[in-house]
């Protein structure tokens, strides 16, 4: 099995990259792909860049060049579920765009023409992630993760997301674009991220302060998940 892992920022991939044995780097289209073995398992780690276009471009390059069997999207996210705090884990059962609006033509809010309203994560990957969470004794929430090209740190943006997606557990800027590409390529995916802020008016400050905490937690989680998937 070859496992694809995608993070947007240097801080979100550096700890994993440092663990890759026989690491080789491919720079392409503004992205970097690191290939090798993580604890003996073939992996391809992508640093995509921030935002939906960068994530979609990177995910497409990763799938075309490296042919991974599954995709794990890792990194940080803003917490929306009331029980979440910095360092907690969120696992997607679905991903949706929070900034797409074609409702004038009868589509659901967040749905693009020709696409499902939401992109469902793979049940087996979700189950494996939840098993890892129990094994590591981490605080975690599973549910809807929403994505858009905005860092949410104000009451207006937050209120709009809560109105349109009252069940959303977290918000970030890449996951749904990655899920969209995986859907088009029929490759199973799951989003496993750690909370860096709680998407409020101080989130830009807490993000800077706690990004390292989120990166460490998500790295531990992803490394454990890779090992579990490799064992079957």
Swiss-Prot record:
GO biological process, one term: L-methionine salvage from methylthioadenosine
Self-association and partners: Homodimer.
Name of the protein described by the UniProt record: 5'-methylthioadenosine/S-adenosylhomocysteine nucleosidase
Entry EC number(s): 3.2.2.9
Enzyme kind, highest EC tier: hydrolase
Amino acids binding substrate: 78, 152, 173-174
Residues at the catalytic site: 12, 197
Functional pathway: Amino-acid biosynthesis; L-methionine biosynthesis via salvage pathway; S-methyl-5-thio-alpha-D-ribose 1-phosphate from S-methyl-5'-thioadenosine (hydrolase route): step 1/2
One Pfam family from the record: PNP_UDP_1
CDD domains associated with the record: MTAN
GO CC terms of this entry: cytosol
Job description of the protein: Catalyzes the irreversible cleavage of the glycosidic bond in both 5'-methylthioadenosine (MTA) and S-adenosylhomocysteine (SAH/AdoHcy) to adenine and the corresponding thioribose, 5'-methylthioribose and S-ribosylhomocysteine, respectively. Also cleaves 5'-deoxyadenosine, a toxic by-product of radical S-adenosylmethionine (SAM) enzymes, into 5-deoxyribose and adenine. Thus, is required for in vivo function of the radical SAM enzymes biotin synthase and lipoic acid synthase, that are inhibited by 5'-deoxyadenosine accumulation.
Assigned protein family: Belongs to the PNP/UDP phosphorylase family. MtnN subfamily.
Keywords: Amino-acid biosynthesis, Hydrolase, Methionine biosynthesis
Catalytic activity: S-adenosyl-L-homocysteine + H2O = S-(5-deoxy-D-ribos-5-yl)-L-homocysteine + adenine; S-methyl-5'-thioadenosine + H2O = 5-(methylsulfanyl)-D-ribose + adenine; 5'-deoxyadenosine + H2O = 5-deoxy-D-ribose + adenine
InterPro entries, A to Z: MTA_SAH_Nsdase, Nucleoside_phosphorylase_d, Nucleoside_phosphorylase_sf
GO terms for MF: adenosylhomocysteine nucleosidase activity; methylthioadenosine nucleosidase activity
Organism of provenance: Enterobacter sp. (strain 638)
SUPFAM superfamilies attached to this UniProt entry: Purine and uridine phosphorylases (SSF53167)
């Amino acid at each position: 099995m070859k496992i694809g892992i995608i993070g947007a920022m240097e801080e979100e991939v550096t700890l994993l990259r440092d663990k890759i044995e026989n690491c080789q780097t491919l720079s392409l289209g503004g992205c970097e792909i690191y290939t090798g073995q993580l604890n003996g398992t073939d992996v391809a780690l992508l640093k995509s860049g921030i935002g939906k276009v960068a994530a979609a471009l990177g995910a497409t390059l990763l799938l075309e060049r490296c042919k991974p069997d599954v995709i794990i999207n890792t990194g940080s996210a803003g917490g929306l579920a009331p029980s979440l705090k910095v360092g907690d884990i969120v696992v997607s059962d679905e991903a949706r765009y929070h900034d797409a609006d074609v409702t004038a033509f009868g589509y659901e809010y967040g749905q693009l023409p020709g696409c499902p309203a939401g992109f469902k994560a793979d049940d087996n990957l979700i189950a494996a992630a939840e098993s890892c969470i129990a094994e590591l004794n981490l605080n975690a929430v599973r549910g809807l993760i929403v994505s858009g090209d905005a860092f949410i740190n104000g009451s207006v943006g937050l209120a709009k997301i809560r109105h349109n997606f009252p069940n959303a557990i977290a918000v970030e800027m890449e996951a749904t674009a990655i899920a969209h590409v995986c859907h088009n390529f029929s490759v199973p995916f799951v989003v496993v991220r750690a909370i860096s802020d709680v998407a409020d008016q101080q989130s830009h400050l807490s993000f800077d302060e706690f990004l390292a905490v989120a990166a460490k937690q998500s790295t531990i989680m992803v490394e454990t998940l890779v090992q579990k998937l490799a064992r079957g």
